[in-house]
Regions:
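Short Pro/Gly-enriched beta-strand edge/turn motifs at strand-loop
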Residues: 7-15, 148-155, 175-177
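Conserved beta-strand hairpin/beta-sheet module of binuclear metal-dependent hydrolase folds
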Residues: 3-61, 108, 193-210
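C-terminal regulatory/interaction regions
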Residues: 276-344
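Active-site HxH/HxHxD metal-binding segment of metal-dependent hydrolases
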Residues: 49-50, 57-172
Length: 344
């Protein structure tokens, strides 16, 4: 277990992804005053190794589950993988209910009849179906069947957990810190963070990371995620520019402005590629057709982790296409259950 104190009373635990798709995840713990509650920001991967590391960290800090609050920034497997386990141990979990507005999301795995039904509708909307793309459709269905047969949940699969709904502006106080909940839309629709104005420190989940362009994970049309992401980054640059930014992946960031500039530049560059792919001829294209052109996808990945990466590519392309449509740079048409994007 690797743990260090990154600010007075705030500890960081570094966890590693055995599936290697994410690499590492950083969980943060704000230790409460004697006899008071402590806070954990996210839980890490849903693996035995991560559980052992987190339990060792809690023992080292002398924090019991019954005195532990857990703030989930968003509902992705690397951030809430242990939430169901910790809830069973009497930890109290907080999350924005907007993270569950849909039963299926392209960037996480969840079993259940409702989720499977919605998945098929989403896949159809981006141009993936048994009729149009039989090999890719079969791969999605095989993965669902494989997950259903596992005795233990796959690390990407999110187990259900009880939680208390949190709202923007709500205050969480632990130790000498008073955090208020901030909206961080973009990476997901309902992602939230924590900000202490006095100590100038903010937990910002996957909104910004140094050297990495976060995925803006569009799964459903008309959610305006990339536009909301740009608005959020602008707010962060203006209001949190002098803060210590604590992301869920990578080192804390002392000067966030250049990191934000690089992320915006990366997305503008990707949107140029997406727009070029869509308007190169007169034929409107689905999200999947555009993704193949932009990323040069020739074969359907057989490896599970590579398949997850491909899903992220589809989601990012979807975000760019929706933003281009909102800015009236491409046309969008919906027919036969599919979205098509083309020249104005």
């Amino acid at each position: 277990m690797k743990m260090r104190e990154i600010a007075e009373g705030i500890y960081e635990v570094i966890l590693h992804d055995k599936e290697k798709e994410v690499g590492e995840m950083r969980v943060h713990i704000v230790k409460g005053k004697p006899g008071k509650r402590s806070l954990m920001v996210d839980t890490g991967f849903g693996s035995q190794e991560s559980l052992e590391d987190m339990e060792e960290a809690l023992r080292t800090l002398d924090i019991s589950y019954k005195d532990l609050d857990i703030f989930l920034t968003h509902k992705h497997h690397d951030h809430c993988g242990l939430a169901s386990t910790f809830a069973k141990k009497d930890a109290k979990i907080f999350m924005n209910p907007e993270e569950e507005r849909h039963s299926y999301d392209c960037l996480y795995m969840q079993m259940g009849e409702e989720s499977q039904k919605e998945q098929k509708e989403v896949l159809k909307s981006v141009g993936i179906s048994e009729e149009w793309t039989p090999k890719l459709w079969k791969r999605f269905m095989e993965l669902n069947e494989w997950m259903a047969k596992q005795r233990e949940p796959w690390v990407y699969e999110i187990q259900k957990y009880p939680y208390v709904a949190l709202t923007e502006g709500e205050t969480f106080s632990y130790g000498d810190y008073d955090f208020w909940v901030i909206s961080l839309r973009g990476h997901t629709y309902g992602q939230r963070g924590l900000y202490d104005a006095k100590h100038r420190i903010a937990f910002t989940a996957d909104q910004v990371m140094e050297g990495i362009t976060p995925i803006v994970g569009t799964t459903h049309a008309n959610e305006h995620l990339l536009g909301l992401y740009f608005q959020s980054l602008s707010w962060m640059k203006r209001e949190l520019g002098d803060c210590l930014i604590v992301p869920g992946h990578g080192e804390p960031i002392e000067h966030v402005a250049p990191v934000i500039d690089q992320i915006v530049y990366s997305y503008l560059k990707k949107m140029d590629q997406v727009k070029d792919a869509v308007v190169k001829d007169e034929t409107p294209k689905t999200v999947w057709q555009t993704t193949k052109l932009v990323y040069g996808i020739k074969e359907i990945p057989e490896d599970g982790e590579d398949f997850i990466v491909m899903k992220s590519m589809i989601s990012k392309t979807f975000s760019c296409l929706e933003y281009l449509y909102e800015q009236e740079l491409v046309q969008r048409d919906y027919r036969d259950g599919r979205l098509y994007y083309g020249k104005m």
